Design a protein with these regions (language model features):
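Conserved ATP-binding/catalytic motifs of P-loop helicase motor domains
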Residues: 1-158
Length: 158
């Protein structure tokens, strides 16, 4: 249903840019989809994932929180999309161990972290503005050896 609704002109521009990015050989440059609340980022994300799916890519979606992952799962189901890997938190995908250090949670890499993205061609990271620099650094390092394409979706106001 949602994949048949028309796109706004801005969404069309983003979809064209995504297709061009997807058609180029992966060079480690991520695709960034940025927009304010209510601008249709999630709606457009489903279209972009349908394009990746049609290209035969192994893909999944992640978010920093379980609540955001739940929202993504609902939208994927409504769009009739089935990711290669079950949607999860970014921490789970990267096989990170969470530990408390003083009053903060810290991510600790495990023996499985380095190869976490080995079989994925594309990962869409929703709520990307909530990903801290340490987690981003781990994600980029894990994606690099496998040329896993990263799509960051976020709100510039957050």
């Amino acid at each position: 249903l949602t994949l048949t609704l028309p796109l706004t002109p801005d969404q069309q521009d983003a979809a064209v840019a995504f297709s061009a990015w997807l058609d180029r050989p992966g060079d480690g440059t991520p695709f960034v989809l940025s927009g304010y609340a209510g601008s249709g980022k999630t709606f457009l994300s489903m279209r972009l994932l349908a394009r990746a799916d049609a290209a035969g890519l192994c893909w999944t979606v992640v978010a920093p929180t379980h609540k955001a992952v739940g929202v993504l799962r609902q939208h994927l189901q409504l769009a009739g999309l089935q990711p290669t890997w079950f949607p999860s938190t970014l921490h789970r995908l990267l096989r990170l161990k969470l530990r408390r250090e003083r009053d903060q949670e810290c991510c600790e890499e495990t023996a499985l972290t380095a190869a976490a993205l080995e079989h994925l061609a594309l990962v869409l990271i929703d709520e990307a503005s909530m990903v801290d620099s340490a987690l981003l650094e781990i994600l980029l390092r894990c994606a690099h050896p496998y040329r896993t394409r990263l799509v960051f979706v976020g709100d510039p106001a957050q």
